[in-house]
């Protein structure tokens, strides 16, 4: 298939409108956002501008230049203070502990409103700790890999007493491809899916896998809990499995090995 890259900030309302008017999109997959829990504490306005205003611009474009399906990235962080695990899409998600999480919850509410008002099929996908090649440099897999290979200390928050549902990028993409082809046919065509490995990993075990893969020992700097963080993320993927017969399956050992191989090649280590 043909591919074109067009650089545009989706807070640019006029530019985005012109793009939709000229291209006549069938499906829109929005993975653009100001991401990250900790950075949202330092730079809150960036999150409102990108994640709320930018998403509103996108919804308006889908309204005025109708599409068959809008799929957008939500986040596991919207589950906030929920202590019930694993997290299911039907669980309440009204207690965010970061502005980032609040903006992602806002996206879901805004999408529901546009699905109800204008019949736009929208699907929010709650990603759980995505990692792999081309991953964000501010996330633990990249930070830990870089530090361990360079012999620098790593910051281990909450003294390592955390669990994350690490999900390999290929599994995320496979799940997205299933979802994209199946917009909701409900009277209000709005839906939500979790995509996660459904196998949370202790942070210290995660570090051990990187150490074993890299053949080096981490220098650990134990830290307290960071504001905006949660102790555990854990996806219930029953809805994804029931609707599409799909479940992410890449083990943390296999995923880190693939990530390590890419990292070494990319950075010529």
Language-model features and meaning:
Residues 1-130, 246, 262, 266-269:
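N-terminal Rossmann-like NAD(P)+-binding domain of SDR-like oxidoreductases, especially those catalyzing
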Residues 8-9, 148-269:
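C-terminal substrate-binding subdomain of Rossmann-fold SDR/epimerase-dehydratase oxidoreductases
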Residues 39-40, 81-83, 134, 166, ...:
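Short glycine-/acidic-enriched loop or helix-start segments at secondary-structure transitions
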Residues 95-103, 127, 133, 137-141, ...:
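The catalytic Tyr-centered alpha-helix of NAD(P)H-dependent dehydrogenases
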Residues 106, 110, 114, 144, ...:
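Hydrophobic alpha-helix immediately C-terminal to the catalytic Tyr-X-X-X-Lys motif of short-chain
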């Amino acid at each position: 298939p043909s591919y074109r890259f067009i650089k545009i900030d989706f807070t640019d309302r006029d530019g985005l409108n012109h793009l939709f008017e000229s291209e006549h999109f069938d499906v829109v997959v929005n993975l653009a956002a100001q991401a990250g829990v900790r950075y949202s504490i330092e730079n809150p306005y960036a999150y409102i501008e990108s994640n709320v205003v930018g998403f509103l611009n996108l919804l308006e474009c889908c309204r005025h230049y109708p599409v068959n399906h809008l799929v957008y990235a939500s986040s596991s962080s919207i589950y906030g203070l929920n202590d019930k695990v694993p997290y299911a899409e039907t669980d309440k998600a009204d207690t965010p502990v970061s502005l980032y999480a609040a903006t992602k919850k806002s996206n879901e509410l805004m999408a529901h409103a546009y699905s109800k008002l204008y019949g736009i099929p929208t699907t929010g996908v709650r990603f759980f700790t995505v990692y792999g090649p081309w991953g964000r440099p501010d996330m633990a897999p990249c930070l830990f890999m870089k530090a361990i290979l360079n012999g620098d200390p790593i910051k281990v928050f909450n003294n390592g007493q955390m669990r994350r549902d690490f999900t390999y990028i290929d599994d995320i993409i496979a799940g997205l491809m299933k979802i994209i082809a199946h917009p909701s046919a409900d009277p209000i065509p709005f839906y939500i899916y979790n995509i996660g490995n459904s196998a949370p990993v202790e942070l210290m075990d995660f570090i051990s896998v990187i150490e074993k893969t890299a053949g080096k020992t981490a220098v650990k700097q134990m830290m307290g809990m960071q504001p905006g963080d949660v102790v555990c993320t854990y996806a219930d993927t029953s809805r994804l499995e029931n609707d599409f017969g799909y479940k992410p399956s890449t083990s943390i050992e296999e995923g880190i090995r693939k990530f390590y191989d890419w990292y070494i090649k990319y950075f010529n280590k």
